[in-house]
Swiss-Prot record:
It is found in: Cytoplasm. PANTHER family: S-ADENOSYLMETHIONINE:TRNA RIBOSYLTRANSFERASE-ISOMERASE. The gene is queA. Keywords: Cytoplasm, Queuosine biosynthesis, S-adenosyl-L-methionine, Transferase. Transfers and isomerizes the ribose moiety from AdoMet to the 7-aminomethyl group of 7-deazaguanine (preQ1-tRNA) to give epoxyqueuosine (oQ-tRNA). Gene3D superfamilies: QueA-like. This is S-adenosylmethionine:tRNA ribosyltransferase-isomerase. Pathway: tRNA modification; tRNA-queuosine biosynthesis. InterPro entries: QueA, QueA_dom1, QueA_dom2, QueA_sf. Its EC number is 2.4.99.17. Belongs to the QueA family. Monomer. It catalyses: 7-aminomethyl-7-carbaguanosine(34) in tRNA + S-adenosyl-L-methionine = epoxyqueuosine(34) in tRNA + adenine + L-methionine + 2 H(+).
Length: 356
């Protein structure tokens, strides 16, 4: 299976650089799993697409203002993007500089924030932030929201709110679980009144989510690792949903990765509590265990996220839906429109299993 199989042409003007004025005011492309038919709807139509007894699973990670600009103490500009907090004062980060800083190098960022490079781990640098103030607090006060590279603009004050879900609570992500950005409080309340249940997992999205697949044969791709937690409460909610005949509906690909990781080694449809790192790579041929339906944004050509969606709803159907979305001028990527997909039971031309 080749990376080029997941290519599609996307005009630059279809990349959303700003969010819609209202979170839930966006388009929703619906793909029928049985017929492959495509319907063009609004996101608020979820009120009719979801049934009482269904379970929506959200990722409650909170995006850190993880980008800082500054310089080395010896001179020379440097840009930092935190990848993962290690403790209250240390973190793993990407550094962009004309010359990679060595261990012992002091960095001075905006707001007189000082950090020292303690070690290098492949492409990541281990930083220790100086002083008594915790690293996360320093970033909240002086950091910039880490907008994806394809948004191609500086972050603005409004991004502090809009590049964050309304239910975000556990700090640790450096990219938003973007399918959840469409849910506002009125829509969530209306769904609850309809009898739709809601549960939460946590996956701290790393900057690796934007790394391209560099190999031609996607089976040779090594997926980046991200930390997640699926707790006992969510496991009980999934079991109860199965018992009443409802659907487990993942809000975003990060929720999919949580649920499918927690389902490894379990009977079909069941999950167990899980806390730790996952590098699960889902592409066509994957044997689904837990997720019945998916709400997701439109993803980059040749990306692992597009491969996951193709595994879920069928490669030919998804690629045809993407071509239709381009023709109908849907907005793409993090601040763009969304899709609603049911899991396809049909076979597809790529029978190989994925690996975890």
């Amino acid at each position: 299976m080749q990376r080029a199989d997941f290519h599609f042409d996307l005009p630059d003007e279809l990349i959303a650089r700003y969010p819609s004025e209202t979170r839930s005011d966006c388009r929703l492309l619906c793909l029928d799993d049985a017929t492959g038919d495509i319907a063009h709807r609004r996101f608020t139509d979820l009120l009719t697409l979801l049934a009482p007894g269904d379970l929506l699973v959200f990722n409650d990670t909170r995006v850190i203002p993880a980008r800082l600009f500054g310089q080395k103490a010896s001179g020379g500009r440097v840009e930092m993007l935190l990848e993962r907090p290690l403790d209250a004062h240390r973190g793993l980060a990407h550094l962009r500089a004309s010359k990679a800083p060595r261990p012992g190098t002091e960095l001075i960022f905006e707001g007189d924030v000082h950090a020292v490079v303690e070690a290098r781990h492949d492409a990541l640098f281990e930083l220790r932030f100086l002083g008594e103030t915790p690293m996360i607090e320093l970033l909240e006060n002086h950091g910039h929201m880490p907008l994806p590279p394809y948004i191609d603009r500086e972050d603005e004050l409004d991004d502090r709110e809009r590049y964050q879900t309304v239910y975000a609570r556990r700090e640790g992500a450096v990219a938003a679980p973007t399918a959840g950005l469409h849910f506002d409080t009125p829509l969530m309340e209306a769904l609850r009144e309809r009898g739709v249940e809601m549960g939460y997992v946590t996956l701290h999205v790393g900057a690796g989510t934007f790394q391209p697949v560099r190999v031609d044969d996607i089976r040779e791709h090594h997926m980046h690792s991200e930390w997640l937690e699926v707790d006992e409460t969510l496991c009980r909610q999934v079991e109860a949903t199965r018992a009443r005949g409802g659907r487990v509906i993942a809000v975003g690909t990060t929720s999919v990765r949580c649920l499918e990781t927690a389902s490894q080694g379990q009977e079909d449809g069941h999950i167990a509590p899980f806390r730790g790192d996952t590098d699960i790579f889902i592409y066509p041929g994957y044997q689904w265990r837990c997720v019945d339906a998916l709400i997701t944004n439109f993803h980059l050509p040749e990306s692992t996220l597009l491969m996951l969606v193709s595994a879920f709803a069928g490669y030919p159907q998804v690629m045809r839906a993407y071509r239709a979305a381009v023709a109908e001028r849907y907005a793409f990527f993090s601040y763009g429109d969304a899709m609603f997909l049911n899991r396809s039971a049909s076979s597809h031309p790529f029978p190989e299993n994925s690996h975890a």
